[in-house]
C-alpha cells in the first residue's frame, strides 16, 4: 500500500498547474477588459504570406509579422485589416494632454485579423497583444499561431510607467532599449528618465561639456548619454508606443552642477545656464510632450520654478512636470502642468493631472509582499483615471551602489514590479488603496483569485519573452504559513517560547505562555511583512507590531520524492537607498532571526561585508550579497514526504538597522533559483490539498447538525458583551457574560447569510434600522441575513447586512449596538478599521444531535490521539462523523472523528 500511496501522489503532482509551452488568450497581460473566444474556431497560422490592408501605418505591427515569418503579398488568402474608427464601443477614455486614446478592437479568425483603433497608438497596443498570443511557439520548434478571439480593450489609466535613476547609477543605452522593447509588450507606455543627480550628470550638454567629464562625477565616472543616443532611444520608444519624459532635476540634487559650473542653479547665472540646457534637452527629445524639472527636497526661492516652467512652455512649447510635494512651496499651475506625487504628503493638486508614485518606490521593496501590495492596490483611491489622476510610475532610486547594472534590475525586482504596476493601471480597479489594503496576500477571495490570475500570466511570460532577464520572482500563491501572535521578549532576541520547544509532530494552533493564550494565524505568500517599512501608513500582517517581541512562522512542505533544491531565504531586505549596517557574521540579520529545516538549523550565508556601515551616495561602498537577490539560492535537501520549515522572528531593538522592517522570505526553488519547484505542497496543517482552513477565530454557523453558542465583544470594549432583554428593545452591552442573554448563535440561512439568535429568548438582531441608530431585537425572522467580513485587525470580523454594519458604541450612547455603516451607505463600503466595528468571538458551547450514524472503518492505519491531536506518519484529512471537513491540527474535544488516509478510514474517539 505504501508504494500505491506515493504513486498516486506523484501523479497528483504531475497534474498540478504548470506553465504551458504555447501562449493562449488566457496569458495576455495586462488582462484585457472584454474577451470572447469562439468555440471550435480555427487559429490564424503565422509564418505564411499575408495581405496587410491598413489605414494606419504601424512599425510595431510590421515588426510582429516579420518576427513571426510572415511576408506581405497583396493577393494572399490570409488578411490583416487595420481600420481607423471614431470610437470603440464600450471603451473608457478621458482627456490627458499629449496622451492618445489607446483603445482597440481585435478580431482573429482562421484567415483574417481585423484591428480597429481610434489612433495609431491603439494599433500599437493591438500589435502588442498579438505579440503575446504568438509567444512560446519558437521554443517548441512549432509554427506560431493566434488563437481565434474577439477582444475589446483599453487602459483605465493613461500613464503606466517606470523611472530609472541613472544619475546615481548608470544603465547602458542597450539596457534601456531592451527595457523599452520588453516593457512595451505589457503596454507600459512612459519612461521617466532621471538624467541628473548630485552624484553625476548623465545628459550631454554641448554648451557645457564639463558637466559630463569624468572628474566631475562621483560614481560611474565618465558614463553619460550623448544627445544622439538620446534621440535614437526616443525614436525607438515612439515606435513601441512609449513616451519618454526626460528629467533635469532643479534646483536640488545638483551638487555636480554647482561644483562644475561654480554657481548655484537658483542664482541668475544658474537660471540662465538652465535655460540653455533645457533648450538642448528639447532639441534632443523632439517627441517629448513633457519635460520634468524636479523641484523637490530643497528650499525654493520665490519664482524659481515658475520662471523655469514659463520658459519650457513659452520658449520650448513643452509641458512641465514637477515633484509633489515640494519642500517649502505648494505646487501651483504656474509651475506645473502635471505633478508626480512621491510620498504620503504628496496629494492631488486640483485642476492638474497627478501621477501616483507615492508607495511605488521599488528600491524599498522586497521581492514578494510589496509586489502583492502594488498589484492589489487601486491608484490614488480611484479605479480609473480622470483629468486629475493620470496613472502611476514605478520608480527605482539607486542611492546605494550595487555591483552591476544587472543587480539594479534584479535587486529591485523591476520586471515583476513594473509589469504588476502597469497591469493594475491598464486594468483599473484594485479593491482598496494600499494605505488600507497593505501588502499581505489574502488567503482566499476575489483579491487572491485576481492575484493568482496575474501571477500565472506573468510566470508564463517569465518563461518565454522574459526568459533571459534577471527576475527573482517565483510562484508564491501556493505558499502557506502559520504565524503566531508575538510573544514579549523584553529585548532578548534569544529568548525561547513554547513553539520553539514543542515536540509535537504537528505544531499546535494555540500556545499558552504565562497564563496567556497566543493564537496562530494562517498566511499566504513567500514574503510576509510583520511590520512594513511604512507601517502604520501601509498596514502589516500584525496590526500593532511593537518592539521587543518574537513571533514564529512555520509550514510543512510535502515533496513527492527526495530531492535537492534551492531556497530563497531573507529576513531583512536592504533597500537600495539609505545608510545601512551589514548583517552580523554568522547570523541571518541583525535581529537574531533563525530558520530550521527538519529540525536542522540552516546556517546564515557568509557575508562579504559583515557588520559594515553601508553608506548611500558612496563612490565605492555599496550593497554586496546582503539581499538574497544577490546570492545563489541556499542549497537544501527535501526528504520524501513532509518537511518541517520553522522560523524564529525576533524584533528586538529594531534590529539595529536603519529601517524598521520585520519580515521574512522563504520559498523553495530549483537549484539555480530561477523557478519554483513543481509538485510541492506548503501546508502548516499537513493537508495534501490546497484547501485553506477556516480561520479559527471566525464563528461557525449553526445548522441542523450542530449549534454553536458564542459571546462576542468589540476591539473598543473587549470587556463588554451584547445582551438581549426583550423584543423590540435595544441591545445593550454589559460586563455580564455568564448568562444566556449574552450568548448568540449564527444560524445559517442557506443563502450565504445568517441570523443572529439569542440563546435565552430566541430573539433576532434585526437589520431594520436607520444609519447611526440603535439596533433592536425582533421576535420574527428577519427578511435578510447578516454576514461576516474580515476586519482590519487579524482575527477580528465585522458584521454587516447590505449597507448596515454593527458598531459597539461608547457610554454616551449607553453602550448600545448601533448601525454604523460607512456613512455613504453604499453596500460593500464598510468600516474595517473602526474599533467599535471589529468583533472577536468566544465559543461558549456546541450542541449536536444525539443520534449519530456509526461510520465504518476499512483500515487499521497507525493513528493515535496524543494531547488531543491526531498523530500519524501518513498524510491525512480529518472529518466529523457527519462528514464535515475539519481543520487538520485542531485541538480535539470530546467526541468521535474520522481520520482519512490513503490506507483507509479510521474512527477515533476522544473521551
Which role does the model predict for each range below?
Residues 579-664:
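Beta-strand-rich ligand-recognition modules
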Residues 333-335, 343-478:
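Flexible, acidic glycine-rich loops studded with aromatic residues
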Residues 11-15, 21-155, 322-327, 333-337, ...:
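Acidic, contiguous N-terminal accessory segments
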Residues 453-543, 576, 607, 644-693, ...:
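Accessory carbohydrate-binding/adhesion or oligomerization-edge regions at the termini
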Residues 99-290, 307, 623, 645:
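Feature activates predominantly on carbohydrate-active enzymes
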Residues 257-338, 342-349:
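Active-site neighborhood of glycoside hydrolase catalytic domains
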Residues 853-911:
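C-terminal outer-membrane/trafficking sorting elements
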